[in-house]
């Protein structure tokens, strides 16, 4: 073997040995050792703990769904027209009866889009300074 090829191979072997786990698992066809049986027991106890947590989570979710189903008829009985108008809501904050579509319609109104170009406000500001954009009058 050439000396210049032996050095990289030796370094790769050392790197592999350094990165390989110390408590690595034996080949599955090999015999069982007490250490492998102990690790399997700890994995089984960990699996049991995860199953216990999963059971608790399922119970909590079913309780929350039952509460939600119990409260759903109460929410259906109140329509938005019956809700009292709250005068204390600030003007800038969206009221509960405002939907997202109404807010988007207000933003797309001709009043808001009067001086907007094709890229949007922020890019139009950049475009007006750099000369890039749709509605830019170039001075030559």
UniProtKB/Swiss-Prot annotation:
Disulfide-bonded cysteines: 118-134
Species: Canis lupus familiaris (Dog)
Tissues in which the UniProt entry reports expression: Brain and also in atria, but at much lower levels than ANP.
Gene from which this protein is expressed: NPPB
PROSITE patterns registered for this protein in UniProt: NATRIURETIC_PEPTIDE
Site positions for Cleavage: 105-106, 108-112
Tree of life domain: Eukaryota
Residues covered by region (Disordered): 71-94
Keyword line: Cleavage on pair of basic residues, Disulfide bond, Hormone, Secreted, Signal, Vasoactive
GO molecular function: hormone activity; hormone receptor binding
One Pfam family named in its UniProt record: ANP
Gene Ontology CC terms, in alphabetical order: cytoplasm; extracellular space
Homology family: Belongs to the natriuretic peptide family.
Protein name: Natriuretic peptides B
Coiled-coil annotated residue ranges, if any: none
């Amino acid at each position: 073997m050439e000396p210049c090829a032996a050095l990289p191979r030796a370094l790769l072997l050392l790197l592999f040995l350094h990165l390989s786990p110390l408590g690595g698992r034996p080949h599955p066809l090999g015999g069982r050792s007490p250490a492998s049986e102990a690790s399997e027991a700890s994995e089984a106890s960990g699996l049991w703990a995860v199953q216990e947590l999963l059971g608790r989570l399922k119970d909590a979710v079913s309780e929350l769904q039952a509460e939600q189903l119990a409260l759903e008829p109460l929410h259906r009985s109140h329509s938005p027209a019956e809700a009292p108008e709250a005068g204390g809501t600030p003007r800038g904050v969206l009221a509960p009866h405002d939907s997202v579509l109404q807010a988007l319609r207000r933003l797309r109104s001709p009043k808001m889009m009067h001086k907007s170009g094709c890229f949007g406000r922020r890019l139009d500001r950049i475009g007006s300074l750099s000369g890039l954009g749709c509605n830019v009058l170039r001075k030559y």
